[in-house]
A protein has these predicted regions:
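Amphipathic alpha-helical regulatory segments at dimerization interfaces
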Residues: 1-6, 32-36, 67, 127
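EAL-family c-di-GMP phosphodiesterase catalytic domain
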Residues: 3-6, 14, 18-27, 44-57, ...
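Short beta-alpha junctions and helix-cap segments that line functional grooves
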Residues: 61-64, 86
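Catalytic-core regions built around general acid/base machinery
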Residues: 31-39, 63-71, 120
Length: 176
C-alpha cells in the first residue's frame, strides 16, 4: 500500500478512491477502508461514487456511504446531472461534495444554457451544505467562469494530468 508512503512524503496531498458500483464499495471494501484509516489520516482520502452507480440500489448506497463517512472519509457524488437521481435521493445521500460532470463544463464559455445549469448546480449544492467540484476543466476561460460562479474545486487537464504513483512520489520528493 502506497498511501502511508505518500503521507510521509507530503502532509497535504489528497487521495481519491473511485467506485463506479455501489456493490464494489460494500462490506469488504468497508473493512479495507477501516484498515486504511488506521494507517492514513482518513480526512485526506475522498471516496467517489458515480451518480448512476449510487442510484442502482439507493437504500444500500446510503447505508454503505454512511458507514464510509463514519470512518472519517469524505464522500463525493461523481458525474452529477448525468444519472437518474431525484432530488429526494440527493438530499438523503451522505455526500459532502457534488462533482459536476464534464459534459456541463465543456461548453460553459460558449453556451448560456450550460452556464446556467452549472450555476444552478453550484447554488443547489451550496444550499444543501455541499461543496462542488467541476471536472473536465481544459481552458482558462472555463476555470475563470467556474471561479466566478463559486465552484469550490476543479479538476481537468488544465490543472494537471493523472500520473502513475511512482511519478507522484518522485514529484513530492523534488518539491519538498
Amino acid at each position: 500500500m502506497q498511501l502511508p508512503r505518500f503521507q510521509e512524503e507530503d502532509g497535504e496531498t489528497l487521495f481519491v478512491i473511485e467506485y463506479d458500483d455501489a456493490a464494489t464499495a460494500g462490506l469488504g471494501t468497508l473493512n479495507d477502508l477501516r484498515v486504511i484509516a488506521d494507517r492514513v489520516d482518513a480526512r485526506r482520502i475522498r471516496l467517489e461514487i458515480t451518480e448512476s452507480a449510487a442510484m442502482r440500489d439507493p437504500e444500500y448506497t446510503v447505508d454503505v456511504l454512511s458507514s464510509v463517512r463514519s470512518l472519517g472519509y469524505t464522500v463525493i457524488l461523481d458525474d452529477f446531472g448525468t444519472g437518474y437521481s431525484s432530488m429526494a435521493w440527493l438530499h438523503r445521500l451522505p455526500a459532502q461534495i457534488l462533482k459536476i460532470d464534464r459534459t456541463f463544463v465543456r461548453d460553459l464559455a460558449t453556451d448560456a444554457d450550460s452556464r446556467r445549469i452549472v450555476e444552478v448546480m453550484v447554488s443547489l449544492a451550496r444550499d444543501l451544505g455541499l461543496a462542488t467540484t467541476a471536472e473536465g476543466i481544459e481552458t482558462d476561460e472555463q476555470s475563470r467562469i467556474l471561479a466566478e460562479i463559486g465552484c469550490d474545486y476543479g479538476q481537468g487537464f488544465l490543472l494537471g494530468r493523472p500520473v502513475p504513483a511512482s511519478e507522484l512520489v518522485a514529484g513530492l520528493r523534488t518539491t519538498s
